[in-house]
Amino acid sequence: MKLLQKKEILLISLMLFSMFFGAGNLIFPPFLGYEAGEHVWISLVGFIISATGLPILGVISIAKAGSFQTLAGRVHSSFAIIFPCIVYVFIGPGLGIPRAGSLAFEMGPGQLFPEAGSGVLLFYTVIFFSIVYWLSLSPSKLMGLFGKVLTPLLLCMIALIFIKSMFTTVGDMKEPIGNYGQAPMFQGFLDGYLTMDALAALIFGIVIANALRAKGIEDDKGLAKYMSIAGIGAGLLLSIIYVILGYVGAISGSLGTFDNGAKVLAQVMTTLFGQGGVVLLGLIFTIACLCVSIGLVTSCSQFFSSAFPKVSYKVWAFIVSVVSMILANLGLTQILKVSVPILGFIYPIALTLIILGLFHKYIGKYAYVYAVTVWIVAIFSAIDILNKNVMMNQWTSVLKYIPFYTEGVGWIVPAIVGMCLGFIVSIALNKNK
């Protein structure tokens, strides 16, 4: 097995970090810090466990399985195509990429020119997605682009904010708000869970695997080893950045009342750097959104070109980029109304697959564990989404009796029940053969 140099491992880790670290990762921790106030540190522990731990486990699970399709194929052969396609569409051009382009505009030119109309947005997104498409055309060069250029630049800017905040009186940590007062660690865990970064772990695996193959790592054992190391490295770096951003949010308590992390960051940046802070924040968002968009376009195009080989990688990259650009300009609000419920439906299924994949060594011989567990979680998830988006919470009076349902993780008990049933069915059918 070929061994990578430490520098190459670092570059792979930085590459994965930059693909994970998008606008949402910039916004969530400051708002957590703002709401947690004096309880920021214990809240961040919970946040990091889920926001960093789940993606790391996702990368490791994919590394063990070999690919997303292989992991999904343990449920059923048709599931190996259908489920990854749904995930790639909705976390890519269906939501993630157009939202990144839109947020890059809102936090950049949109902050400097609040009266800018749709024409300016169109001009900006044409340039933004042209750059994304151009840089996505050479997947083999992404490790150098992310590891040597974009990620160090992004980290330097975030470090500048942290250093400046340490030597500037910004504000005081206030009393925690809501559940951050009673159960700060658990609330932090729930907020980290809602970042849904574990979904990204499933689809970025193909990019990391191909980057490793370009470095001569061809065997399954080597790919699994270095993908896992990259996942842990990216997770550690994410944790450090979350602590910095959480602290920045915590000291903003006396600066005003805010309803989201973007407003917290904007106010802190203005306090620290004046009008120049708005420009710096715009650059940070632009680079973060650019990295995520490139990663998503690349991973989606690599997947679709392998699943549907009659259309080349470059054509898929063009299609994904153009569709994302159009959606960023034409009704992102409407897209969110459709995409967010679908993501809410597939997220518990994806997490169930990740957990099962981690223990495949022990459960793989039981033929029905994957299928029964995933289908029970899928049924519960569908009922939950219908309740929230169609039935206007009419079923909540019944569903609330499921443990952890009101906290947003009610799928855990159905998953455990499904796993137990899967074992029973597997053993029973095996005995009857």
List PLM regions with ranges.
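Hydrophobic, membrane-embedded alpha-helices of multi-pass small-molecule transporters
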Residues: 11-21, 162-171, 180-245, 280-289, ...
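Hydrophobic transmembrane alpha-helices that form the core helical bundles
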Residues: 31, 78-114, 289-306
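Selective recognition of specific alpha-helical transmembrane segments in multi-pass small-molecule
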Residues: 53, 57, 153-165, 227-252, ...
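Membrane-water interface regions at transmembrane-helix termini and the short interhelical loops
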Residues: 62-71, 129-150, 214-217, 326-338, ...
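TM-loop-TM module centered on a large, flexible mid-protein loop between adjacent transmembrane helices
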Residues: 69-73, 241-290, 297, 341
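Hydrophobic alpha-helical segments and their helix-loop junctions in multi-pass secondary transporters
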Residues: 93-97, 155-180, 198-199, 247-250, ...
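Membrane-interface loop-to-helix entry segments
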Residues: 135-165, 339-351, 370-378
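C-terminal membrane-solvent junction of multi-pass transporters and transport-like membrane proteins
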Residues: 354-420, 428-433
